[in-house]
């Protein structure tokens, strides 16, 4: 049985990503690149994306709060959640995140800016 992310993936990398994503408050977003940098892996945005795409539902990770650098919901294929692109937008909007007419979030307004991920 999988008890945490490091057990599932054989390394602590996904666990570090999940720990940072858990800190994103309601009504804020972070980018994949931002999450990668905050976990000590600058320029590894795709690794953050892979980790979130593989998130077991049981971990209760707020994966929906992570978007791409253009402020958009990235297309994803989640094994347990068909329609997750629409779901991601719905969840963000329910938390007060606003999308413009082009489907973008204003990152200057809604980006999470932590002082430290260790606090």
Residues covered by each model-derived region:
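Nucleic acid-binding interface residues in structured DNA/RNA-binding domains
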Residues: 2-119
């Amino acid at each position: 049985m999988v008890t945490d992310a490091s057990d599932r993936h054989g390394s602590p990398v996904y666990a570090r990503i999940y720990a940072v994503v858990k800190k994103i408050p309601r009504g804020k977003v972070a980018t994949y690149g931002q999450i990668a940098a905050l976990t000590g892996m600058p320029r590894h945005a795709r690794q953050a994306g892979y980790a979130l795409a593989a998130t077991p539902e049981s971990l209760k990770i707020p994966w929906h709060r992570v978007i791409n650098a253009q402020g958009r919901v990235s297309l994803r294929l989640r094994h347990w959640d068909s329609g997750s692109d629409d779901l991601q937008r719905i969840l963000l909007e329910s938390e007060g995140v606003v999308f413009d007419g082009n489907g973008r979030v204003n990152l200057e307004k809604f980006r999470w800016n932590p002082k430290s991920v260790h606090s």
